[in-house]
From Swiss-Prot:
It is an enzyme of class 2 (transferase). Pathway: Amino-sugar metabolism; 1,6-anhydro-N-acetylmuramate degradation; Cell wall biogenesis; peptidoglycan recycling. It catalyses: 1,6-anhydro-N-acetyl-beta-muramate + ATP + H2O = N-acetyl-D-muramate 6-phosphate + ADP + H(+). SUPFAM superfamilies: Actin-like ATPase domain. Keywords: ATP-binding, Carbohydrate metabolism, Kinase, Nucleotide-binding, Transferase. One of its GO terms (molecular function) is phosphotransferase activity, alcohol group as acceptor. This is Anhydro-N-acetylmuramic acid kinase. Coiled coil: none annotated. Belongs to the anhydro-N-acetylmuramic acid kinase family. GO terms for biological process: 1,6-anhydro-N-acetyl-beta-muramic acid catabolic process; amino sugar metabolic process; peptidoglycan turnover. It comes from Actinobacillus pleuropneumoniae serotype 3 (strain JL03).
Length: 369
């Protein structure tokens, strides 16, 4: 059978590295055939982290980071293809998200900024590259995020149940796939970002593997209540957020007593905050039908988070996308392969019911090989 391969490339707000996957669109539903990961070089991660936390840089520095990211994507793709015995001619197109450094969908001049020079990606790989997926949605009145729910709808929706796909990356976002209703999707809360930043600050680790540190801590109810008292949670959907809100500066503002707590107790509380802020939203969606929560993203590998979701959602079946045929670490990368496929065929790939856009459009800028 003829293959129809597209390569999805994603680097998220966690800054851990680059996810890559190949999707075969000759299959129905499309099939994930290969996946891989390239760690973010430490010097680039440091520069990006500073940029995300401060929001300040020089034009020269921004241009250099843009170039370095383009090279990272290109080299990651070439290495990935070689490892999987694939050539550039096997791939119809690359869908590359780029690296979000700012997302501000409200105000007088809404904008989103993803960097990483896609001219370099197309030139160095010899593969047509599709990128800049968010700004056209914003141009027609949308939030520019999230983009993945349309992909989730095609893969996971069922007329027999309410399905919510929860992606726990740096930020937690959901796709709500309800029978006979338009799909909706939006950011609901922080994901791993605060937990990752806190353990990096106190233990110089990138993340809390298997929640080992959080499990040694004790919940701080007063801090949890303060964190949950965040105006973002009261905003109507669709809505989007990022590290420009949920960061260590925000955490400090939320608690005058932060330095008096044991760091591991704060970590345990941040984990609980991640779960409870999501659960509060899910409980507003519960229906009489079967309810399925499908978790993906790095947070789906956190046993403490998954345990607490199961405990706090007794009416729901709680599972990961692994159990439904899509590796939890590569759902977003797979979605960008799908977005590229849709763009190449000039098909719409945003959902106005999700982003708030005035109309469905075909997102993505094409960078020819």
């Amino acid at each position: 059978m003829t293959k129809n391969l597209y390569l999805g490339v994603m680097s998220g707000t966690s800054l851990d590295g680059v996810d890559l996957c190949v999707m075969d669109f000759a299959k129905n539903p499309p099939k994930l055939t290969a996946c891989g990961f390239t760690p973010m070089p430490e010097d680039l991660r440091t520069d990006l982290s500073h940029l995300l936390k401060s929001g300040e840089t020089s034009l020269q520095k921004l241009g250099e980071i843009d170039h370095r990211l383009g090279l990272l994507y290109a080299e990651s793709i070439k290495r990935f293809l070689a490892e999987h015995q694939l050539s550039a001619s096997d791939i119809q197109a690359i869908g590359c998200h780029g690296q979000t450094v700012w997302h501000s969908p409200n105000g007088n001049f809404p904008f989103t900024m993803q960097i990483g020079d896609m001219n370099l990606v197309a030139a160095h790989t010899g593969i047509t590259t599709i990128a800049d997926f968010r700004r056209k949605d914003m141009a027609v009145g949308g939030q520019g995020a999230p983009l993945v729910p349309a992909f989730h709808e095609g893969i996971f929706a069922s007329p027999e149940r309410l399905t919510v796909v929860l992606n726990i990356g740096g930020i937690s976002n959901i796709s709500v796939l309800a029978p006979q209703q338009p799909t909706i999707g939006y950011d609901v809360s922080v994901g791993n970002a605060l937990m990752d930043s806190w353990i990096e600050l106190h233990q110089a680790k990138r993340y809390d593997k298997n929640a080992e540190w959080a499990k040694t801590g004790t919940l701080i109810p007063a801090l949890l209540d303060s964190l949950l008292d965040e105006p973002f949670f009261k905003l109507p959907a669709p809505k989007s957020t990022g590290r420009e809100l949920f960061n260590l500066e925000w955490l400090v503002k939320k608690s005058a007593n932060l330095t008096t707590y044991r760091p591991e107790d704060v970590q345990r509380t941040l984990a609980e905050f991640t779960v409870q802020s999501v659960v509060n939203e899910l409980k507003t969606l519960e229906s009489e039908k079967q309810c399925l929560l499908l978790a993906c993203g790095g947070g789906a590998r956190n046993p403490l988070l998954m345990q607490r979701f199961s405990e706090l959602l007794p009416k729901w079946q709680v599972a990961t996308t692994d159990e439904y045929g899509l590796d939890i670490d590569y759902v977003e990368a797979a979605a960008f392969a799908w977005l590229a496929y849709q763009r190449v065929h000039n098909l719409t790939n945003n959902l106005p019911s999700v982003t708030g856009a005035k109309e469905p459009v075909s997102l993505g800028v094409i960078y020819p090989k």
